[in-house]
């Protein structure tokens, strides 16, 4: 169902500022480090998000009333132009689990720092990671490295999906640990992307690496 801002009744101050048009860019929220408390904020400011179901898994646990079975779903969302999110959802049925995962992915949305960081590429476009970065989740660790334009995404399928949704087209990678575990590999990739924005660099260095922000 498409989002209709006119039907939205914001419950938070931030939501009201978005609906009235005072906040028109999600970067204003990210720059202040404010948490997103309403999904409609993301729907209004980043309306072109795409969704990809990464994994559907059956999870069982013992309860005093018997064995409980839930579906655990991992979903990635992104606009293929610098914004991506990853979320997990659990429910007794697949449909509700997917919806929960999509919602959580939107709450976890981040802006991804992109650039042209490979020394052999001088295109100046935002097609790769601007510098080497590492991410970790449980036993899985991943390194993402700048690659020249045209190389493509040299990473596992889970990583390709997330990086593609983030708008990264070229990357070299190394991974260690139980990378066949989708949830951990996906979280490690996402952790690496979050680290991109956390690394401090001078404006001059960022300009050299083709970073636009």
UniProtKB/Swiss-Prot annotation:
The keyword Ribosomal protein applies. Keywords: Ribonucleoprotein, Ribosomal protein, RNA-binding, rRNA-binding. GO terms for molecular function: rRNA binding; structural constituent of ribosome. It comes from the Archaea. One of its GO terms (cellular component) is cytosolic small ribosomal subunit. Residues 49-112 form the S5 DRBM domain. It holds the Pfam family Ribosomal_S5. Gene3D superfamilies: 3.30.160.20, 3.30.230.10. GO terms for biological process: translation. The keyword RNA-binding applies. InterPro entries: Ribosomal_Su5_D2-typ_SF, Ribosomal_uS5, Ribosomal_uS5_arc, Ribosomal_uS5_C, Ribosomal_uS5_euk/arc, Ribosomal_uS5_N, Ribosomal_uS5_N_CS, Ribsml_uS5_D2-typ_fold_subgr. The N-terminal domain interacts with the head of the 30S subunit; the C-terminal domain interacts with the body and contacts protein S4. The interaction surface between S4 and S5 is involved in control of translational fidelity. With S4 and S12 plays an important role in translational accuracy. NCBIfam families: PRK04044.1 (NF003125), uS5_euk_arch (TIGR01020). Belongs to the universal ribosomal protein uS5 family. Part of the 30S ribosomal subunit. Contacts protein S4. This is Small ribosomal subunit protein uS5. It comes from Methanobrevibacter smithii (strain ATCC 35061 / DSM 861 / OCM 144 / PS).
């Amino acid at each position: 169902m498409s989002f209709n801002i006119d039907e939205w009744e914001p419950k938070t101050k931030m939501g009201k500022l978005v609906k009235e048009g005072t906040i028109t860019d999600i970067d204003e929220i990210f720059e202040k480090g404010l948490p997103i408390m309403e999904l409609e904020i993301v729907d209004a400011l980043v309306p072109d998000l795409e969704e990809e179901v990464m994994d559907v898994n059956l999870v069982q646990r013992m309860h005093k009333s018997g064995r409980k079975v839930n579906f655990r779903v991992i979903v990635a969302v992104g606009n293929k132009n610098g914004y991506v999110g990853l979320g997990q959802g659990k429910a007794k049925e697949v449909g509700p689990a997917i919806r929960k995962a999509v919602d959580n992915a939107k709450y976890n949305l981040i802006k991804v720092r992109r650039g042209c960081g490979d020394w052999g590429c001088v295109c100046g476009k935002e097609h790769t990671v601007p510098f080497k970065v590492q991410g970790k989740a449980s036993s899985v660790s991943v390194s993402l490295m700048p690659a020249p334009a045209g190389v493509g995404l040299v990473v596992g399928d889970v990583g390709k999906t997330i990086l593609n949704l983030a708008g990264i087209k070229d990357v070299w990678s190394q991974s260690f640990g139980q990378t066949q575990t989708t949830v951990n590999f996906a979280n490690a990739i996402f952790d690496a992307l979050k680290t991109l924005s956390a690394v401090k660099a001078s404006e001059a260095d960022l300009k050299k690496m083709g970073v636009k922000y």
